[in-house]
Each structure stands twice: as C-alpha cells, then as structure tokens.
C-alpha cells in the first residue's frame, strides 16, 4: 500500500516516515499547503487504493494550511490515519470541537486504557505512549468511536465505515514502547477495510 503523507510542518514527521519505510511502505511526502485537488488527482492515479496519513503539527486544524480541505476531499474515498493534530483535524471534520486540554504535555509518557479492538490485538489492555499536545477533541459525534482514552481525553478514535483511524499520542515516540507494532497494525487494519 502506498502512503500519501501530509507533513504539517512538524519535527516528528520524518520520524514517522522513517518508521513507515522500515515497515516496507512506499511513502510520498507532501506538505499541508499542497493544492487539495492536485493531491486527490495523484491519489486517484494509483492502481491500488492508497492511504492518506496526517502527521502531527503545531497549532490547530484551522491554522494548518489546506489540511481540512484535504480531509474533506479524501474522507470516504481513501483510508486515513491521523496522528495528534491529525486526530484533531479528523475529529473536527466530523463536528467535534477542539479545545485546550486541562493538562499541557510535551514529552510525557502516559499509560492509556485500550478498549478491545482489532487494531490493538496483542498489545494488552493498556499501553504506555508518548504525548505531546495542549489541545484535545471534545464532543465527538457517535460515528467516531473512542477506542483508547486517558483522563477523558480521546487517545484513539475510529470510524470503520469511513476507514478513519487516529491517535492523539505519538506512535513514533521512543516513549511509545510498542509504537512500530501499532503503526504496522494500524495500516494493516485500514488496508483490511478496503
């Protein structure tokens, strides 16, 4: 599966690209200021359905270039995997509010509770993850299922019908001990929904 990776001008982006390439995926990187129509044309030219990957980034979804337009055009057409800002942008695209978290974290290892879901197979009931965020998604609609959380903050959301999966934490962080396995299972899970 080819991955179209949206870089939200974040220092973690190429750590994620490296992890995905180590897993054997072909990754094409585009920044969030790319013309959304051009990106959709590129994705539609692929012989097999590609995956759209949304990186972490500074700020909020509204200040992230063409990110929300890209999501609006890709949603329901391509599987989408979002990390941190990626979760917030996907949640906002479904009507959730993005608010300031009661705790600002930058490089904090946190044990989060995992719900029983295929994407977490073999990873246990909780997982230590690396968190870097000051914002969170709130007021999620019913069509976004929260499959992991910490202190009432959604840490993982999914919409299987629309092939959407997102994490508030950073799988590529050294603090996320099973991060590579989770990335592999995440891409595999979305690929299996095609």
Swiss-Prot record:
Residue span, Glutamine amidotransferase type-1 domain: 2-194
Key word Magnesium present: no
Entry superkingdom: Bacteria
Entry-linked PROSITE patterns: GATASE_TYPE_1
Example GO molecular function: anthranilate synthase activity
Active site residues per record: 84, 170, 172
Function text: Part of a heterotetrameric complex that catalyzes the two-step biosynthesis of anthranilate, an intermediate in the biosynthesis of L-tryptophan. In the first step, the glutamine-binding beta subunit (TrpG) of anthranilate synthase (AS) provides the glutamine amidotransferase activity which generates ammonia as a substrate that, along with chorismate, is used in the second step, catalyzed by the large alpha subunit of AS (TrpE) to produce anthranilate. In the absence of TrpG, TrpE can synthesize anthranilate directly from chorismate and high concentrations of ammonia.
Subunit composition and interactions: Heterotetramer consisting of two non-identical subunits: a beta subunit (TrpG) and a large alpha subunit (TrpE).
Name of protein: Anthranilate synthase component 2
Source organism per UniProt: Helicobacter pylori (strain ATCC 700392 / 26695) (Campylobacter pylori)
Lineage, broadest ranks: Bacteria, Pseudomonadati, Campylobacterota, Epsilonproteobacteria, Campylobacterales
């Amino acid at each position: 599966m080819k991955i179209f990776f949206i870089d939200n001008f974040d220092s973690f982006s190429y750590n994620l690209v490296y992890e995905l390439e180590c897993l054997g995926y072909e990754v094409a990187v585009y920044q969030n200021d790319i013309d959304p129509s051009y990106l959709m044309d590129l994705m539609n030219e692929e012989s097999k359905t590609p995956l759209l990957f949304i990186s972490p980034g500074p700020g909020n979804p509204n200040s992230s270039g063409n990110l929300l337009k890209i999501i609006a055009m890709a949603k329901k057409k391509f599987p989408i995997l979002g990390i941190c800002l990626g979760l917030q942008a996907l949640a906002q695209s479904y009507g959730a509010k993005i608010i300031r978290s009661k705790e600002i974290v930058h490089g904090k290892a946190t044990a989060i509770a995992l719900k029983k879901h295929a994407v977490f197979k073999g990873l246990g009931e909780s997982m230590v993850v690396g968190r870097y965020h000051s914002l969170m998604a709130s007021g999620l609609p019913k069509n976004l299922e929260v499959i992991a959380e910490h202190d009432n903050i959604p840490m993982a959301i999914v919409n299987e019908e629309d092939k959407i999966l997102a994490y508030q934490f950073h799988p590529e962080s050294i603090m996320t001990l099973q991060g590579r396995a989770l990335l592999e299972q995440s891409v595999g899970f979305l690929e299996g929904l095609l």
